[in-house]
Amino acid sequence: MKRLLFVILLTIMGCCGVHVQAVGYEKIINPVLPGDRPDPTVIEINGEYWAAATSNEWSPLFPIFKSKDLVNWELVNYVFPDGAPDWALNNFWAPELSYDEKQGKVYLYYTA
């Protein structure tokens, strides 16, 4: 009896059309920040969004961006506009922006 039920179940499953859709991969072109900017951090200050991201040894300037809509970003400046000091030339990543309302200052922390 169990064998008969098993055969009936297999037959029913075989008769049911299984539609398998091929998985297609499409390239999504929607960069949040221009260029190679891993580990971004974003904060909102008075209706504007501010962002920073990991730099690298080839460009250790630590860029700062701002946006009003989280889509269109403007490069504002760099933490080190004249080039990073020797102590900050490499191994800095995963920044974090923090805003102190009382002082009206933005702090930028990096993992080293």
Model-flagged regions — what are they?
Residues M1-L4:
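Positively charged n-region of N-terminal signal peptides that target proteins for export
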Residues F6-C16:
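Bacterial N-terminal signal peptides
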Residues V18-A112:
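Carbohydrate-active catalytic/glycan-binding domains of CAZyme proteins
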